[in-house]
Amino acid sequence: MTRPRHAGAFVPVCAALLLAAAAQPPRLEPPPQTPIRGLTEAPLLARAYDLVYDADFAGADAELKRACGPAPAQACDVIGAAAQWWRIYFDLDNRSADQAFTARLNTVIAAGERWAAREPERAEAWFYLGAAYGVRVQYHGQRLEFLAAARDGKRIKISMEKALSLDPGLDDANAGLGLYQYYADVAPSVLKVLRWFLGLPGGDRVQGLAQLRRASESGVLLKAEAAYQLHLVNLWYENRIGEAIQMLSDLHARYPHNPIFLLNAAQAHEVYRSDRAAALAIYMELVNGARGGSLREPLLAEMWGHLGAAVQLTALAEPDRAADEARAVIARRPSAPYGAVAQAQLELGRALDALGSRDEAVAAYRAALGAVPAGDPRDTGRAARQGLSHTPDRINTEATRLSIEGWRTFERGDAAGALAPLERAVQLRPDDGVHRYRRGRVCLAMQDRARARADFERALQVRPLPPAPFVAASYYELGGIYEASSDRTRALSMYDAAARAHGASAKTRSLAQRALARLR
């Protein structure tokens, strides 16, 4: 399973916000009688921010140049810093741009402090100051710099509260405050004990969610950012996986050139739904989109796709295809994502081990160790050493090799030639549901329905069960066998099980649904 990129981005920020409140906040002066409300030239700035979210960084820079002048310079500087953060966020393991980024952001924050001091009655001055601190909190949180994040968390809360006190209709400010309210309430128990010990103000989960939703629906600048953070909340704490995936789909529809929404959707299917078939489909969409020119940051997108696909294919009993995906990365020797070659060599070793090619697998593990980048943020070295120290069971790997050989022969249209290697695979590992399913498909193609039915039934009885797509496909094929024998009741039962099976491939689910519609 690939480790989710960017996962936990706001967990350390949550801790930071709670710790920040330990310091006594300065007493806010009452707002002036004539506060200055609104965001100057908001449509121009929103256009630039939309380009950032669509990963069009050059376009965003050009749009900011047009917007600045009519729009406040500080607003443009904050959005420019956010764009630079997104560039880093795309490849978080790479720290080479950190120093330049923090220097730029510190300058932006200092300018924001001066603006708020000059015009304390202007809501947008406080808003952009809080937004600048928000960018830096994300950076500190990702780098596990908790004390620095805590200091900035306090400043975000103060700045956004000040902005809302001056302009209650400034919905964008609800994004930052909503995150504070939510995480202060749902924080892990250790943080709640700390909050009680220090006398920190508590949060309100319901209010926090409402503020995040308000910002995601009515915000001008931070609408997309609020939606992105809300999808993380839904994944991590609310257990609204489907809603989170739908939010990513909506973001991808709005910003179709940004590959990160596809990446995050693939990871959500993989990690939170254990739906490797759906994850694989999206990883391949990344590859195809990068090659076809529909995605920006094409190198990153394609490598994310190949690496993710390799992991899924090994888990889905197709290690030969997994090896091909890993080799596609190795052949490119990409500069990004950070450590991609080491990860690809590791996945190649795992795929080759599954196929029984131990010597080649050992070479791949050693190549992974040689390619591990500074800091080894993905812990690839440890995984490669484990691969070197563990020799797979030879009977298992031989059965897998034969099963793949037979299945690829069948895919080429040679059912008769596929049968012998699959027979041998089942003989070696009779309780492997993958081998049973594959032999069942060959028997069905050869009109031997009795043997096919026995294999599909056995694939559903073995423990552990085969990967989910094989379970769903076995139900579907049994439905076809029962339908052919005019057993409508059992056919409906099997088709229904196939359509409902968790982790079924999109093709199997569609075929089962069509069969149900036909029989009903």
Placement of each model-derived feature along the sequence:
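Short coil/linker segments at helix-helix boundaries
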Residues: 26-47, 51-64, 70, 80-169, ...
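"A position-specific structural signal for the A-helix of alpha-solenoid helical repeats
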Residues: 46, 79, 86, 128, ...
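Residue at a conserved register position within TPR or TPR-like alpha-solenoid repeats
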Residues: 51, 84, 91, 133, ...
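Amphipathic alpha-helical segments of tetratricopeptide repeats
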Residues: 68-69, 110, 158, 210, ...
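Alpha-helical linker/edge segments of TPR/alpha-solenoid repeat scaffolds
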Residues: 87-99, 138-139, 184-192, 237-242, ...
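TPR/TPR-like (Sel1-like) alpha-helical repeat modules
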Residues: 157, 200-210, 284-288, 353, ...
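Alpha-helical adaptor scaffolds
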Residues: 226-236, 270, 303, 307-315, ...
